[in-house]
Regions:
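Non-catalytic interface/linker regions that flank or bridge core catalytic/transmembrane domains
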Residues: 2-132
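Acidic/His-rich, divalent-metal-binding segments that scaffold phosphate/diphosphate chemistry
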Residues: 87-195
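Divalent metal-dependent catalytic cores for phosphoryl transfer on phosphate-bearing substrates
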Residues: 168-274
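Exposed alpha-helical structural elements
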Residues: 9, 48, 100, 104, ...
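A generic secondary-structure signal
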Residues: 13-16, 162-166, 211-214
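Metal-dependent nucleotide-binding catalytic modules
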Residues: 251-260, 264-304
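Generic hydrophobic secondary-structure packing signal
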Residues: 9, 152-155, 200, 204
Length: 304
């Protein structure tokens, strides 16, 4: 559980970001000039850990980094970071040979800062977010596969901006807006670097279930956030016939769950490529799927 002060600053940042006319909503995230600059970058952290442990074999490296909740792995294109580095419940004095790893992890997770050029309010808000959600740090600079124009973190912020700008988002109750905000921040939290990752909705939902334990919220709220994350790829599964409209309707019939997923799907599509062509390619399918599934949901709710 994180402190009340960190929690309050986290939610205050999100509340400020969603306000009409906020610096966040007025920022052109699609610009090539927009970037999230870390004082201690993800890439530097990976290189420092690799250099520090270069004389250890793979099993020894895994054992050492595992103490801190992460692993350094060689992917198809990149040396990548898996997991979420942390020094929680660890004392540097007790770690002997791992003490230097402790200091690198502490610098990356607890002492790090984000800078966004010419965006002082958004810089402050993002630093409040990473204090409560340091897992987000692992996404900054994490390259996606070739279809995407943005790293995972910038993509996530663009999705959040698209969600908060959506007309239907403004009509949602406060709790639904909060759930959708948290779902967006973690919807790609486990996405693999530099490759297509079909498992990430399920894996991200699973990890989010653990990450959300740091917040004092009811189990039903956590479950709803994880439901949104697990099904944020509903459009692809609908379009490819992987999941039937009836199955979607049964799973997503409660409250505003499907409406929130439609808002998320549109923002997600628009946040893939700078030129917007990915959204143009699938917007008709999105509309068709939304109509079909909504009709079945209406029938189920009416018959209940």
């Amino acid at each position: 559980m994180i402190s009340n002060e960190i929690t309050q600053k986290f939610f205050k940042a999100l509340d400020e970001m969603e306000k009409q006319g906020s610096e966040f909503l007025c920022t052109d995230i699609s610009s090539c000039d927009f970037s999230l600059e870390l004082k201690y970058s993800r890439r530097d952290f990976i290189e420092d850990i690799n250099r520090l442990l270069q004389k250890h074999d793979h099993a020894q490296k895994t054992d050492i980094t595992g103490l801190f909740g992460f692993a350094i792995e060689q992917g198809p294109l990149y040396t990548t970071l898996r997991g979420y580095p942390s020094v929680s419940n660890l004392n540097e004095e007790d770690l002997a040979q791992s003490a230097r790893v402790f200091r690198y992890v502490k610098e990356f997770v607890e002492e790090n800062e984000i800078t966004i050029k010419d965006r002082p309010q958004l810089t402050k808000q993002m630093n409040a977010i990473i204090k409560a959600l340091p897992e987000f740090l692992t996404l900054i600079g994490k390259v996606q596969h070739h279809t995407h124009s943005y790293c995972v973190a910038v993509h996530t912020l663009k999705v959040l901006q698209g969600v908060m700008s959506h007309a239907d988002y403004q009509k949602l109750p406060n709790e639904d807006r909060r759930n959708l905000q948290l779902a967006v921040l973690m919807h790609d939290i486990t996405k693999k670097e530099g490759e297509i990752d079909k498992t990430h909705p399920v894996c991200s939902a699973k990890d989010a279930g653990f990450i959300l334990n740091k917040f004092d919220m009811p189990k039903a709220q956590k479950d709803d956030i994880c439901l949104l994350i697990r099904n944020h790829d509903w459009l692809e599964r609908y379009n490819k016939g992987i999941t039937s409209t009836e199955e979607f309707a049964k799973t997503l019939k409660n409250g505003n769950d499907f409406l929130m997923l439609c808002i998320l799907a549109q923002a997600d599509l628009k946040a893939v490529q700078r030129d917007g062509m990915f959204y143009e390619k699938y917007k008709d399918v999105l509309q068709k799927g939304a109509i079909e599934i909504n009709e079945i949901i209406h029938s189920l709710v009416t018959a209940a």
